[in-house]
């Protein structure tokens, strides 16, 4: 069921109250009905659970907080204004008052709720793939489109390379060269043997990153290898023997800190990242090697398929654009057509 929409007047009042709470924090002011609460302070959301959020204060302490009903959305990584409570019923010890403007936000489409944010304020999106459950260039390309759309730098990480034979390693290196040639950084690592982990740690240092990718590619194992030894280990699931598909270990996005500097948001894995909320033009621009050819096709409404005079297809045929990327571009549109067909019923 769709949610009731606020009127324009209600939206203005909600926004005015939100701005007032941000301004009160800056002035150190408190409202009369907030006296049971402590002073407003800055915090960061480390995880979100329904109508509650875990908020970390400046000293690294974590408080489970209620959310003001006027907050439009709250996700892991959000910078917030919150107040600690004097009592702690049911483990709740504060309330989130307001959310600061986001520097960046990663989203995904939802059939019922439109576009939903996943996490905020990251400056690097780590696209984790692996040989098991399968090496999917399609999912890598989908996440690259998402990265280009939100203008956040991607890092492609191929895990479980300890499973490679010399012959299969050569084949995988050739596939990863597709991305290196167009300017993307690719790291090949193993959380089991430690191969490639030092350059990976260096790439995460001093940045706020988010782990994305398929279920079962080893994001939790990588996180365990990156966190200090004294940190509580993250639960790890294996690939299902029955389906051959990855199983979800992480169920909600959570923010972690590295002792060597930097922060990481671990997000739940997906089977396929939907992009049907994006316009066709934005998807085409999300394939960065297409950009110099966009607008140069013979026909303005070129679909970059079998259309005569298509500049992008010409670049594929000449070897300038990889046919694997071109095929995945069309797979995205095929899946969008299937989603739209289901939504029409």
Curated annotation (Swiss-Prot):
Top-level EC class: hydrolase
One of the protein's GO biological processes: ribosomal small subunit biogenesis
Lineage of producing organism: Bacteria, Pseudomonadati, Pseudomonadota, Gammaproteobacteria, Enterobacterales
UniProt subunit comment: Monomer. Associates with 30S ribosomal subunit, binds 16S rRNA.
UniProt cross-references to InterPro entries, sorted A to Z: G_CP_dom, NA-bd_OB-fold, P-loop_NTPase, Ribosome_biogen_GTPase_RsgA, RsgA_GTPase_dom
Annotated PROSITE patterns: ENGC_GTPASE (PS50936), G_CP (PS51721)
NCBIfam families: PRK12288.1, ribosome small subunit-dependent GTPase A
Domain (CP-type G) ranges: 103-273
Family: Belongs to the TRAFAC class YlqF/YawG GTPase family. RsgA subfamily.
Skewed-composition ranges (Basic and acidic residues): 23-34
Main location: cytoplasm
Protein name: Small ribosomal subunit biogenesis GTPase RsgA
Any one of the GO CC terms: cytoplasm
Binding site for GTP: 159-162, 213-221
Cofactor names: Zn(2+)
General function of this protein: One of several proteins that assist in the late maturation steps of the functional core of the 30S ribosomal subunit. Helps release RbfA from mature subunits. May play a role in the assembly of ribosomal proteins into the subunit. Circularly permuted GTPase that catalyzes slow GTP hydrolysis, GTPase activity is stimulated by the 30S ribosomal subunit.
Subcellular locations according to the entry: Cytoplasm
Cofactor note: Binds 1 zinc ion per subunit.
Keywords: Cytoplasm, GTP-binding, Hydrolase, Metal-binding, Nucleotide-binding, Ribosome biogenesis, RNA-binding, rRNA-binding, Zinc
Region (Disordered): 1-36
């Amino acid at each position: 069921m769709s949610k009731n929409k606020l009127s324009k007047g209600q939206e203005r009042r909600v926004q005015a109250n939100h701005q007032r709470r941000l301004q009160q924090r800056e002035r150190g002011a408190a409202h009369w009905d907030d006296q049971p609460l402590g002073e407003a302070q800055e915090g960061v959301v480390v995880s979100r659970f329904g109508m509650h959020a875990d908020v970390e204060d400046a000293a690294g302490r974590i408080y489970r907080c209620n959310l003001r009903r006027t907050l439009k959305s709250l996700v892991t990584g959000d910078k917030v204004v919150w107040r600690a409570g004097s009592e702690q019923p049911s483990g709740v010890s504060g309330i989130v008052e307001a959310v600061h403007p986001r520097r960046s936000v990663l989203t995904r489409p939802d059939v019922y709720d439109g576009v939903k944010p996943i996490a905020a304020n990251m400056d690097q999106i780590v696209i984790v793939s692996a040989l098991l459950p399968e090496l999917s260039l399609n999912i890598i390309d989908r996440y690259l489109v998402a990265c280009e759309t939100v203008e956040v730098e991607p890092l492609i990480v191929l895990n479980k390379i300890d499973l490679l034979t010399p012959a299969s390693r050569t084949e995988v290196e050739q596939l990863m060269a597709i991305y290196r040639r167009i300017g993307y950084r690719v790291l090949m690592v193993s959380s089991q043997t430690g191969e490639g982990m030092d350059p990976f740690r260096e790439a995460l240092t001093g940045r706020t990153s988010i782990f994305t990718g398929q279920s079962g590619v080893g994001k939790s194992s990588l996180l365990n290898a990156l966190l200090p030894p004294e940190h509580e280990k993250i639960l790890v699931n294996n690939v299902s023997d029955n389906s051959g598909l990855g199983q979800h270990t992480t169920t909600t996005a959570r923010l972690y800190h590295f002792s060597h500097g930097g922060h990481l948001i671990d997000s739940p894995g997906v089977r396929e990242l939907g992009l049907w909320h994006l316009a066709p033009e934005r998807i085409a621009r999300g394939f960065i090697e297409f950009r110099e050819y966009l607008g140069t096709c013979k026909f303005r409404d070129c679909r970059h398929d079998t259309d005569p005079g298509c500049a992008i297809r010409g670049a594929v045929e000449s070897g300038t654009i990889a046919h694997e990327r071109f095929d995945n571009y069309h797979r995205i549109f095929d899946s969008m057509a299937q989603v739209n067909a289901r939504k029409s019923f």
